[in-house]
Amino acid sequence: MTYNKETLKEAIVQKLRLNYGCTEKQATDGEMMKACAMVLRDIMAERGVQTRENTTREEKRKVHYLSLEFLMGRSLMKNAFNLELLGALNEAIDELGFKAADIFEMEPDAGLGNGGLGRLAACYLDSMTTLEIPAAGYSICYELGIFKQKIVEGQQVELPDDWMQLGDAWLLPKLQEAEEVHFGGTVRTRWDNGHLMVVHEDYTRVLAVPCDMEIAGYDTDHVNTLRLWQARSPKPIDMKLFSQGQYLHAAEERAMADAISQVLYPEDNHYEGKSLRLKQQYFFVSATIQSIVRKHIQQYGTVKNFHEKNVIQINDTHPTLVIPELMRILVDDAGMDWDAAWHIVTHCVAYTNHTVMAEALEVWPQQLFETLLPRVWQILQEIARRWQQQVDDFYHDPAKTAKLAIIWDGGVRMANLCIAGSMAVNGVSALHSEILRKDLFKDACQMQPDKFKNVTNGIDHRRWVSQINPGLDSLIRDLTGGDGYLTHPMELKKLEQYVGDTSVLARLDDIKKANKQAFADFAKKQQGVVLNTDAIFDVQVKRLHEYKRQLLNVLQIIYLYQRLQDDPDLSIPPQTFLFGAKAAPGYAVAKRIIHLINSLADQVNSDPLCRDRLQVVFLENYRVSLAEMLMPASEVSQQISTAGKEASGTGNMKFMINGALTVGTLDGANVEMHELLGDENMFLFGLKADEVEHLRHTYDPQLLYQRDPVLRRAVDTLKTGFRDGVTYEDIWQRLLTDTDGPADQYMVLADFAAYCDAESRMRHTYEDRNRWNAMSLTNIARSGVFAADRAIAQYADTIWHVPYKK
């Protein structure tokens, strides 16, 4: 069926009548949003059936992308855009008596992720579908998301994010495809005719019910699926306890099961939290791999060719338990011998590493495995024993055996399990992959050098330019001769020929001004804040973590504020600093830094001296839909992590493709951006990764503090506090003393002077509007390499070995 404005109107009206028992005149905005979603869902579902039939008939190899996060954002506009129905849907909504903008605004962000890891997974799903790779994403259907951030008296407060109230319109429950996951119990083994028979008994059963979200690609009828698992108890209530009046106890089993799929990243600084997180991870991978194996056997009647027809890509260490779980299924359920099963596992599982931070390389207490996952624990012990033997045979060095051990000192090291059980291990930027090869995983890399690869991250440029920045999209189409860049992003290179064209640069400037005004209107409506649109929009939005160094930005703003106090006639362009970040609920220091940003904002914004000159704003509840408004309006992109700590970053790419200029360190993908742009098109500063490592052994922040009066004055403001009466001596101590770990672990003070200089260079350049806009256009023109389509093609060529649409 061909869809246009009229057929969409008919379909929407029918959905309203059949699902909500109302006409278009009676429907609420929420009902209208859900009806529109259901219409698009039906179109995608139909195409999805056809896609899966083609994949089955042609016996294509499938890619299964496992990630604990998928930060999807809103889907109504995205799906309409990919289905090339956005214009028709806008008109249909308007003609039914609604405002299309209001309907799109009704949709909540899907609460399935937190940061860059989840947004990357969402971008990759879009690209896999656009490139017509048979693929599926898998995750948990978090009913309350990560959390909704509220700022109360300057501090973060976490509220439940009940996104499914409206967001469930995209989900298709598949009760008939539910899987059963087992926790606890005991394991007995016996030999029978040379075969090891395993009996797992007295376990707790949890049902994993799949809810499928269809994923449409651009310029294709190919549709892939994101399968989200909901945890349910097979026994909704204990009737015996209920009839005795023990109502809470009667529903206890149900509540324990429900908890598994309620919240992303439950706090784990206590035993119960660790237990719940491990349950989440096992629940997710067990349901996923059972489902994949079941479908494979239905098609082929054997598991012997499983690795030839399936790739299991694990996004960070969270899904690592898929390795022992697939072994369990192959050995226990399919009756394979160990070596044959291990051959299959190590020829279909691939691991993407996303961090070099020690605390993020998951290590689980052995005791949890013994209690919660007794059979998986047995398999893990055997994997660990054989891997240890392999390391021993290669190195004959007890120190290296200890370093590479999977089980060591009462802990289970997930990254080492990934290395042992995967066919490929990749980093996500050239610098990051080099650190993996030469430092973090150096010993494993020497054993198996061909296993280690690099695939630099990429972004869904169709969403992050064409969909969210129509003014820039229109300019690109005019200058490159059409919409070819949407499927061939390297066509953006054609923009370079206009870098000296003042009329083009003036148009680019006008587009940025319009986007700044649109964001200012949004910020006023959402948060009641009035932004100065004549100021530089200087933006740092990302997860709040000390290594991302929001604190460095704060100190630089304090320094700038102090300069204005010393010299009220100081001639600098007006600057608006925009922050957006969520801190993990248990990360006390990160939450204090959010409080600090808000204390500084209160001080600066209430000072008459700063009016129309300096402004600081913390944007509440940073999320994809907020980023979609902010990125097109941003002029300066702060990418200032300690060199060697950020694996890649993708925010840097989104800013770049929208024409913001980067103030940054040579870290993550900034390195590759610098190779493309040179010093002349970004504002680099600070220590390099090797210099950070070299300095670490002798670094003394106290020395810098004593020698540099400008730095000392800025840092001491943390002790003296702000007009709200709040002081931050704890953060001061963290920078200058080693009472809680190494002083200034992320070298904020070491890079302070260089950072202030980079900001000064940026301000000076900003005043030359032609030069600034030429740099901006150059950034856009050279950003095509950071498209997710390029990254997925690289995965397909070098790791997955699957064909794709060229």
PLM feature segments, named:
Residues 1-806:
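A conserved ligand/cofactor-binding region detector
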